[in-house]
Swiss-Prot record:
Annotated site (Important for activity): H104
InterPro entries assigned to the protein according to its UniProt record, in alphabetical order: 4pyrrol_synth_GluRdtase, 4pyrrol_synth_GluRdtase_dimer, 4pyrrol_synth_GluRdtase_N, GluRdtase_CS, GluRdtase_dimer_dom_sf, GluRdtase_N_sf, NAD(P)-bd_dom_sf, Shikm_DH/Glu-tRNA_Rdtase
The keyword Zinc-finger is annotated on this UniProt entry: no
Name this polypeptide is given: Glutamyl-tRNA reductase
Domains: entry comment: Possesses an unusual extended V-shaped dimeric structure with each monomer consisting of three distinct domains arranged along a curved 'spinal' alpha-helix. The N-terminal catalytic domain specifically recognizes the glutamate moiety of the substrate. The second domain is the NADPH-binding domain, and the third C-terminal domain is responsible for dimerization.
PROSITE patterns linked to this entry: GLUTR
Catalyzed reaction equations: (S)-4-amino-5-oxopentanoate + tRNA(Glu) + NADP(+) = L-glutamyl-tRNA(Glu) + NADPH + H(+)
MF-aspect GO terms: glutamyl-tRNA reductase activity; NADP binding
Source organism of the structure: Acidovorax sp. (strain JS42)
Catalytic residue positions: C57 (nucleophile)
CDD domains, alphabetized: NAD_bind_Glutamyl_tRNA_reduct
Pathway annotation: Porphyrin-containing compound metabolism; protoporphyrin-IX biosynthesis; 5-aminolevulinate from L-glutamyl-tRNA(Glu): step 1/2
Gene Ontology biological process: protoporphyrinogen IX biosynthetic process from glutamate
Amino acid sequence: MAVWALGINHHTAPLDLRGRFAFALDQIAPTLHGLRDSLSSASGRHPGVETAIISTCNRTEIYCAAEAPALDHTLDWLAHSGGVSPALLRSHSYSLENGLVARHAFRVASGLDSMVLGEAQILGQMKDAVRAAEGAGALGTTLNQLFQRSFAVAKEVRTSTDIGAHSISMAAAAVRLAGQLFEDLSQIRVLFVGAGEMIELCTTHFAAKNPKQISIANRTLERGEKLAARFGGDVMRLADLPDHLHEYDAVISCTASSLPIIGLGAVERSLKKRRHRPMFMVDLAVPRDIEPEVQQLQDAYLYTVDDLASVVQTAQAHRQAAVAQAEAIIDAGVQSFVHWMELRSPATQNGGVVPLIQQLNSQADEWRALEIARAKKRLAKGEDIETVLEALSRGLTQKMLHGTMAELRAGDAEARAQTAQAVSRLFLRSHSKNGL
């Protein structure tokens, strides 16, 4: 079994390119079906391919497992889905196979590959992705094992190291940037666009500064009302946002919209109504919620997820010792996963151990079924049960030892000597070692 991964993230691709490959959670299942169909139709070698997709603000990654790798076809499929050329995607992506896939997945789950080093949110996002793959019937034994081990390694990293200490979240970074623009955050009005997990985190951090007003704009009022009620805020429909945008000093947006929901014109009109008082805006969505041209307006201070990178990395130096500890834990996890793969892979030098065990069990079951059938026939004829049991046991013994006896007699002297050593080790151990 081969495992491969293809992805883009904040290290390799700019924000606008990442936005082309962002998949909302409810899009994952049909997307996985499309990928599996594509891999299966491209080659008969991939009828049972396993797939999973992780899509967040900072990364989109495809994980696959099949009898043979198909990285090139996976890249072509992803490029087509994002409407870019394979050459462009290749220049901004990374591809990994087997043990390197495990190392990468373990680092991602542990927060070592995040923009916010040590952040815990990615672990929940990975679990959501795995549940989506399971629900789509796209997850098999190999990828399930990979991700379950990823979660176990991440848990050990967080409990055994200080990787999450001193970290500054994206939400906290937004508050810090707002504090650089406004002297007193308790005197500002803040609008949050969306009602997902990231907006909830941002609302929590801003609420701690006791702003003058908190408002939630969301496509559905019910979800927005629940969040607003927690923080004593009010709520509006997303459609009403342009009419009220000028009322807010700070706007934090993170929705799953495929197109910008706050345009240049709306912000220009709002700034005029505000008589050019500054407006602080943070766009945490991928793809963008706020048109990038807004950044050119004199009184609009627009920040994206990539702009927050320098803020969230300020405490990174304090966590280098924890990173080294985490990498050691990950190394051990990778070795364990690779060993698990080798045991199950028929591509190893002497064949996979697990497939061989399965074949031995299958052969033994055939012999057992045959001898039991013979014994039942003899019992039905009225033969003595002691005689039947003796024949059954002798028949099983002969079948189990026939191949071994034949091998001991075959080949040259050197081959017979090697076979004799193996047979002695397997069959002539002491009773205590055999557990008898």
